[in-house]
Amino acid sequence: MENSEFILEAKNIVKEFDESDGSIHRVLDGVSFGVKHREFLSIIGPSGCGKSTLIRIAAGLETATSGKFFLDGKMVSGTGAERGMVFQKYTLFPWLSVKQNVMFGLESIGYGKDEAEESAYQWLQIVGLDKYASYYPKQLSGGMQQRVAIARALAPQPRVLLMDEPFGALDAQTRSQMQKYLLEVWKNIDITILFVTHDLDEAVFLSDRILTLQANPGKVKEMVTVNVPRPRTEESLFLPEFVTLRKHVEDLIHPVSETKPQEEKFNIINMVGKKNAAK
């Protein structure tokens, strides 16, 4: 493990849940992959593939039934400051100011108040919110709240930033702005990002590689290398390589064999509708 090319590595992750009828539901089935140092790797797959469960196991928020995650060659056990986490839902404490929210994570790992305050302010400068340090979460937009959450996750200087659909609750315009902002932060600091999304464009736009999963149970379908040149802008979405890659990822997640029965169902509905209209 010490000679691995990966900073974060999943080895044969299996996750099972007990159902109310006594049966066992396997969500993840032998998932293995690695994330390289300073890489931006996204996980995408159909509903029920276990992508959020997988990243929660990486964060130490859930335990795998079998299999392990390794960080810098050492087995991951429980949560740790070396892994920052950002969720889809806004997880800021409403009774704390913006600065106090960022300080909270630092003080919880042993920073003194003065040191935590100085570091929090520096990170708020990095995410462009230092002027809002005394504001409370309810006074901020959704995008600004997620920037605070990112600052809080990055302040302890983790080795890896884990992000579970962090922009899923944002409107399209804010989401696009946050994607570009995240790439700018990632470019300028020493951080590796593992990012869960259900959005094809987002996965291709952000990532160096994309891990595609199949569902029921969740298994690795294919690891896709993103050959779209950086830096990426709105114009990147119209590049031939972007369009081709997006189509390839879409076909992996929703194969023709799965979409055809659905198309046949709609054809039957249309035929019945035409017959009824002719009566």
Regions found by a protein language model. Give the residues of each.
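The feature captures the beta-strand-to-loop junction immediately N-terminal to the Walker
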Residues: 44-46
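Helix-to-loop junction immediately C-terminal to a conserved catalytic motif
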Residues: 59
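Hydrophobic anchor residue at the start of the ABC signature
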Residues: 86, 150
